[in-house]
Amino acid sequence: MKAAVKFESVLKDHLADAEQAAKYLTACYEEGPEVFLQGLRDVVEAQGGMSRAARLAGLNRESLYRQLSRRGNPSLASLNAVLTALRLKLR
């Protein structure tokens, strides 16, 4: 019998690739703000974690956690900083 593979593990491996991450975020964006923020959290985790993203984006780690939380309301500047740090762009 084949061993089960966790979905989260497969997703994380998939999202480590910038091109795949961009496609994933585009699909998430089309579903609405809550889904987009969850997608962005997924990509951040897959590409090194929140601490790394905050450092590269020039943002405070705790603040970034709050902004990207389920109740978060990140500014456009923060979103742009994170996306730029991940080498992604809004179109």
Feature-to-residue mapping (PLM):
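Generic, well-ordered alpha-helical segments
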Residues: 28, 32-36, 45-46, 56, ...
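Amphipathic alpha-helical interface surfaces
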Residues: 21, 36-40, 49, 60, ...
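Short alpha-helical DNA-recognition segment
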Residues: 46-66
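Short amphipathic alpha-helical elements of helix-turn-helix/winged-helix folds
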Residues: 27, 42-43, 85
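N-terminal flexible/basic segments that precede or flank functional cores
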Residues: 1-39
